[in-house]
């Protein structure tokens, strides 16, 4: 409300479920937002909102790339459950140590993403990520990979190439606009 005395936000620790009503991009004071609107079993509309861009102006790669990758495999009117997740460095290291054949790395970082299920089954990515065996092709459903370059300000360190970040971001925005047209 305008007075700020009542919050309409509800935090869901076990995911948000409902029938897919709409997917849209909305401008706001805090930047463009990717909105996925579900209609719950009580008929209430539940808006799941994610910042579309990171602080560098590229598509946010924790949640939005993940969501956009799945949109073309989602249909309006079907029921979905949306979960956000966080995998801590400690959990990743523990998993690698406990799993045969996994290499334990020197350093781990937080990993975040979104899982979407329909009827208990995972919604697969429509967009695949570029690998050595699966190259990026203009107009296809393979996203271009980020290229890492030497950081001249910090010798011995690498940073993301701005050109490859922009190319990847443009790919995801184009894909989002095409997917949203169907919602």
Regions found by a protein language model. Give the residues of each.
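Acidic, gly/ser/pro-rich intrinsically disordered tails
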Residues: 152-183
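OB-fold ssDNA-binding interfaces and closely related basic DNA-contact patches used
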Residues: 1-55, 59-72, 88-153, 159, ...
């Amino acid at each position: 409300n305008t007075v700020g005395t009542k919050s309409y936000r509800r935090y869901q620790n076990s995911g948000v479920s409902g029938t897919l009503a709409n997917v849209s991009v909305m401008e706001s004071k805090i930047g463009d937002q990717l909105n996925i609107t579900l209609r719950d079993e009580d008929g209430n509309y539940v808006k799941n909102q994610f910042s579309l861009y990171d602080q560098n102006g590229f598509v946010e790669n924790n949640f939005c790339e993940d969501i956009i990758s799945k949109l073309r495999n989602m249909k309006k009117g079907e029921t979905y459950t949306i979960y956000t997740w966080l995998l801590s460095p400690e959990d990743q290291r523990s998993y690698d140590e406990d799993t045969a054949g996994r290499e334990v790395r020197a350093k781990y970082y937080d990993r975040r993403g979104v899982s979407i299920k329909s009827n208990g089954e995972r919604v697969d990515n429509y967009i695949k990520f570029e690998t050595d065996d699966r190259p990026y092709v203009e107009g296809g459903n393979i996203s271009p990979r980020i290229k890492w370059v030497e950081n001249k300000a910090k010798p011995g360190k690498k940073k993301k190439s701005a050109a490859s970040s922009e190319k990847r971001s443009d790919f995801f925005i184009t894909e989002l606009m095409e997917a949203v047209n169907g919602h």
